[in-house]
Amino acid sequence: MSIHNPYLQKIYQQVCDRDPNQPEFLNAVMEVLSTLEPVIERHPEYEAAGLMERLVEPERAVQFRVAWQDDQGKTQVNRAFRVQFNSAIGPYKGGLRLHPSVNLSIIKFLAFEQIFKNSLTGLPMGGGKGGSDFNPKGKSDAEIMRFCQSFMTELSRYI
């Protein structure tokens, strides 16, 4: 995929310069910008309004730690994230991903795509996503519960 519109090329380059180590997010932005190219060509007022600049930058991105106890009473620490994109049509909506591969780039990518998924439902909701590098596989139900309780307690400080 490539972008031919100079305005969208500039937007994509700004995102690349700002977030060079976030390949999942950069791929999602490239895909969306190239898809929206015909729309931007027909509506120059979107450029004048800075619509795309606002669309590709999250309103909030938070990284935090989640400390929880395993079944042996040992404290474990995981990294967690919450990214919120574009509340123009309503509050943020999006789920949680718990997987060892989770990082900021993945959560930004998922939150960015959530904007479009939510807008297509017709419900007034913006896009958001949260997650952690916590791996629930092999954990007991009690460990998963303690992790989730700690995750929500920590997240509540920011939303």
Language model region names:
Residues 1-159:
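N-terminal ligand-binding/catalytic initiation module
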